[in-house]
């Protein structure tokens, strides 16, 4: 890690493809911005899709990975081993457009430090990564590369016609960038593959806040979902994509047999198409499991639907849940796990690699699966449902461990250290 010239840093610009909704990058960015605000910094945003304050945001549509031109390039650049000259031309046309607007963002908002959220980690928007890299290289601007996951962790990015661009920008080797990763395995891989040192800052949660309980607004959620008295609500707080392992949660519910359980998948996003959604819907039907995924009752915030009914947010779902399922095959860290322990809900979790290395050793009490559901997993879940004292002891212990190891206070300490690497003390 390198020291840049000493300078006053007061205005921080977050840069990513989107800052909207409840995906891990958007949620973690909000936490960083909150803590940096408490530390006295002003935060601004550059992205292609946003729900941040408009007066602090520069919105450039081509920065979003779902923009038609960007999505078309993705199809042409991966799953192949070479690219046409026309593709190169389109990449550089978009790169130049984005680069110009990034310079405008830095000037208009008088940015002192860039925090690049995953846009230099995973190539969802290749021109954008190139543009960010060139701006930092040309200005020597202090930057933090906050990496949530890397392209070498995803099968679909391993064959490409853009290896030269991946080497250049995902992530780049530039003296003014301090790299931050969210787990110890990512730190090791970044060192081995790129020769870059990095700081580990795990995902965090505001354990000093008060969790939302069942209130006058959300007490109707169960009835609106068609649940009866004595039914159990299992919450899978993830997107509908294959690595989230929703089929394991379906199997778990099926094996509980005698209990009436509704399995609710909270997120609407299907970033990797609809094939997996169709698969889990058919699987749930085959096993006669009551699955709700992509419900119009759920949104990013409370509100009213087209016909005047209530829209519930993720926190309403947590407040009403009896158990949280988290059977992911892979996670960069595990935001949903922290949310579940904050809301003091029992958790069934798969021992994905980062959980095994960075979270499990802390001593959380959960129902575990290791790649697949076992009789022991089912037995442990049954005990959580049937034994209130066991459930209370586990959830209270988990909350205290979360507060100790994954709090905003820890985030502030780590951010101060990273910012000091730019020669800034304070």
Show where each model-derived region lies.
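A charged, aromatic-enriched C-terminal amphipathic alpha-helix characteristic of glycosyltransferases
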Residues: 386-420
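Aromatic "clamp/platform" in nucleotide-sugar-dependent glycosyltransferases that forms part
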Residues: 329
């Amino acid at each position: 890690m390198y020291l840049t010239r000493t300078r006053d840093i007061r205005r921080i610009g977050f840069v990513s493809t989107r800052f909207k909704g409840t995906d891990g990058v958007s949620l973690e960015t909000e936490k960083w911005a909150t803590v940096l605000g408490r530390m006295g910094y002003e935060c601004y945003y550059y992205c292609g899709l946003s729900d941040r304050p408009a007066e602090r945001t520069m919105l450039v549509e081509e920065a979003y990975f779902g923009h038609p031109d960007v999505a078309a390039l993705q199809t042409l650049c991966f799953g192949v081993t070479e690219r046409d000259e026309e593709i190169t031309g389109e990449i550089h046309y978009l790169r130049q457009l984005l680069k110009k607007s990034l310079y405008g963002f830095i000037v208009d908002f008088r940015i002192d430090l860039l925090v690049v959220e995953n846009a230099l980690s995973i190539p969802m928007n290749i021109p954008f990564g190139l543009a960010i890299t060139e701006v930092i290289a040309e200005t020597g601007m202090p930057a933090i590369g906050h990496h949530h996951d890397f392209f070498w962790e995803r099968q679909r990015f391993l064959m490409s016609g853009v290896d030269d661009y991946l080497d250049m920008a995902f992530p780049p080797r530039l003296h003014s960038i301090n790299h931050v990763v969210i787990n110890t395995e990512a730190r090791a891989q970044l060192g081995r593959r790129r020769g870059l040192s990095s700081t580990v800052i795990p995902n965090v949660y505001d354990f000093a806040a008060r969790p939302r309980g069942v209130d006058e607004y959300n007490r109707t959620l169960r009835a609106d979902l068609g649940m009866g008295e004595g039914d159990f609500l299992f919450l899978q707080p993830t997107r509908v994509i294959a690595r989230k392992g929703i089929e394991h949660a379906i199997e778990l519910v099926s094996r509980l047999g005698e209990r009436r359980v509704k399995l609710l998948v909270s997120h609407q996003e299907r970033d990797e198409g609809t094939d997996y959604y169709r698969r889990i819907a058919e699987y749930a039907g085959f096993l006669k499991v009551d699955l709700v995924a992509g419900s119009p009752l759920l949104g990013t915030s409370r509100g009213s639907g087209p016909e005047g009914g209530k829209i519930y947010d993720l926190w309403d779902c947590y407040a009403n849940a009896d158990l949280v399922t988290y059977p992911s095959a892979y996670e960069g860290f595990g935001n949903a796990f922290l949310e579940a322990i904050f809301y003091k809900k029992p958790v069934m979790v798969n021992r994905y690699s980062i959980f095994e290395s960075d979270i499990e050793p802390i001593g959380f009490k959960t129902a575990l699966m290791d790649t697949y559901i076992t009789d022991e997993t089912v037995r442990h879940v049954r005990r959580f449902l049937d034994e209130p004292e066991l459930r209370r002891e586990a959830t209270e212990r988990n909350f205290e461990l979360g507060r100790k190891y994954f709090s905003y206070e820890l985030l502030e300490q780590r951010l101060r250290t990273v910012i000091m690497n730019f020669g800034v003390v304070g």
